[in-house]
Amino acid sequence: MGNELIHLTDATFQQTIDNNKIVLVDFWAGWCGPCRALAPTIEELAKEYSGKIVVAKLDVDENPETAEKFQVFSIPTVVLIKDRCEVERIVGLCPRKQYDGALQKHL
C-alpha cells in the first residue's frame, strides 16, 4: 500500500480499489471552499494511516464518471471502501474525529 496521498482518475480508480484492502476517497473540486478546508485533514490522514490504508483524492470535475458511479451529489464527500465495497460515507466538512472514527471501525 502507498504511504502518500494519491490522486485518482476515472482511469485509475478501479485498479486502486481492486489492489488495496481499504481506500479512503475524498471526492472534491478546486472551486469548493469546504473541499479546500478539508484538504489538510485528508493529507494528515494519509500520513498517519500510512501502511494501513490508501488515502486518495478524486476531482469530480475532471472525473465525472466515477463521481456519478458513486452518486456523489455534494462535495466534499469522503467514501471509505473496504474489500471493494463502500462501508462509510461522510458528506460535507466534518470534524477530524469523525474521519478517524470511521477508519478505526474498519481497520
Q: Each predicted region: which residue ranges?
A:
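Short pre-active-site segment immediately N-terminal to redox-active cysteine/selenocysteine motifs
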Residues: K21, W28-W31, S74
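Hydrophobic beta-strand anchors of alpha/beta hydrolase catalytic cores
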Residues: L24-V25, V55, V78
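Typically the conserved alpha-helix immediately C-terminal to a functionally engaged Cys/Sec
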Residues: R36-Y49
